[in-house]
UniProtKB/Swiss-Prot annotation:
CDD domains from the UniProt entry: AAT_like
Quaternary data: Homodimer.
Gene3D superfamilies: Aspartate Aminotransferase, domain 1 (3.90.1150.10), Type I PLP-dependent aspartate aminotransferase-like (Major domain) (3.40.640.10)
Origin organism lineage: Bacteria, Pseudomonadati, Pseudomonadota, Gammaproteobacteria, Alteromonadales
Chain ranges passing through the membrane: none
Keywords linked to the UniProt accession: Amino-acid biosynthesis, Aminotransferase, Histidine biosynthesis, Pyridoxal phosphate, Transferase
SUPFAM superfamilies: PLP-dependent transferases
Protein's name according to its UniProt entry: Histidinol-phosphate aminotransferase
Length: 368
């Protein structure tokens, strides 16, 4: 009966395979015994005191303390910010707000984050693909000529910088060029989930943020899941002009941010920016050390430049890729196999965990 009633295109659709979903067992003890280096989570846990006052009441639609805290952090007015359940909800809201089912399309630049296509497919939007290209200057950059050929065919264009799973950063010039290309025909979404790993110091100019006031078709996605080490909260932010925020507010659920989430997130954004920055500095240092180590391994043929909290690398062949992956899994160290992604044959991705976790991983792989 369900197959009769369900939307036909969803019956055989493969859902997004999140890192936890791939290795979920339902056994908390087993989960805690594993080293999770496959979801780009930050290591360590914070301690937070919560108030139980008014827990019997629904939270504000958009908690003002949270919006003000993020406003101070990103130097945008509150009217330009929408708090969401992670950046993933922002992706979904954008597609639902701008794309009519079975009429409009989104554009993606693979290899890229899988939820853009999954969310589009769920909504019945078409998917146009313009793959990233390697240039003499850098890997995985935008194909601007390819993008020009798609003007008028897509309503939403997703750019990821730093990219996931590649880790590369798109230049400001490339991002601005893409915005110019689509300024009269599509919204350009710049996913900056890993932005903090590119920022050298607190208070530094946030270049892409300025584009919001310069163009009507710019949306930026941010999250507290990565550098802020709050993946379990599911708290993200969609940044754009007031008209876009007003539109998305018509589509979002009435109570998207739980009161405890807003309370913790507000405290972290107000009091713990220095803690976040120290975490970023540590992760970046470990990333560079791991990248250099990988380059010395006989089974590794390429290490991608990264400005995020992970390293993507390519093995010589599928057999060696499987040996690396399976050896780690056998010892409860989980990394991400990206080899099914376009252009990423035999590629694996390692999240930057703690210093001890990375040392354990290297020690194990040195036995190959």
């Amino acid at each position: 009966m369900i197959d009769k009633l369900a939307r036909e295109e969803l019956v055989d659709m493969v859902p997004y395979q999140s890192a936890r979903r791939l290795f979920a067992s339902g056994d908390n003890e087993q989960a805690n015994s594993r080293t999770w280096l496959n979801a780009n989570e930050a290591p360590g846990q914070g301690q937070y005191q919560l108030s139980s006052e008014n827990i019997n009441r629904y939270p504000d639609f958009q908690p003002q303390a949270l919006l003000k805290a993020y406003s101070n952090y990103c130097n945008l007015p509150v009217d330009n910010i929408l708090a969401t359940r992670g950046a993933d909800e922002g992706i979904e809201l954008i597609i639902r707000s701008f794309c009519r089912a079975y009429q409009d399309s989104v554009l993606i630049c693979p290899p890229t984050y899988g939820m853009y296509a999954i969310s589009a497919e769920n909504h019945g939007a078409g998917i146009i693909s313009v793959p990233l290209v390697n240039t003499p200057e850098a890997q995985c950059q935008l194909d601007l000529e390819g993008l020009k050929q798609q003007v008028g065919k897509a309503k939403v264009v997703f750019l990821c910088s730093p990219g996931n799973p590649t880790g590369n950063t798109l230049s400001s010039a490339q991002i601005k060029a893409a915005i110019e290309i689509f300024k009269d025909s599509a919204m350009v979404v710049v996913d900056e989930a890993y932005y903090e790993y590119t920022n050298k110091e607190l208070g530094a100019e946030q270049v892409n943020i300025k584009l919001i006031s310069q163009y009507d078709n710019v949306i930026i996605l941010r999250t507290l899941s990565k550098a802020f080490a709050l993946a379990g909260l599911r708290c993200g932010f969609t940044l754009s002009n007031k008209a876009v925020i007003t539109l998305l507010s018509k589509v979002i659920a009435p109570y998207p941010i739980a009161a405890p989430v807003a309370e913790i997130a507000s405290k972290v954004l107000t009091n713990d920016l220095d803690v976040m920055q120290a975490r970023v500095i540590s992760a970046n240092s470990l990333r560079e050390q791991l990248s250099e180590w990988l380059k010395q391994q006989k089974w590794c043929s390429d290490v991608f430049d990264s400005n995020a909290n992970f390293v993507l690398f390519r093995c010589n062949n599928i057999d060696e890729k499987n040996k690396v992956f399976n050896l780690l899994v056998e010892h409860n160290i989980l990394i991400r196999d990206q080899s099914k992604q376009q252009q990423l044959e035999n590629c694996l991705r390692i999240s930057i965990g703690s210093e001890d976790e990375i040392a354990q991983l290297k020690q194990l792989l040195e036995t190959l």
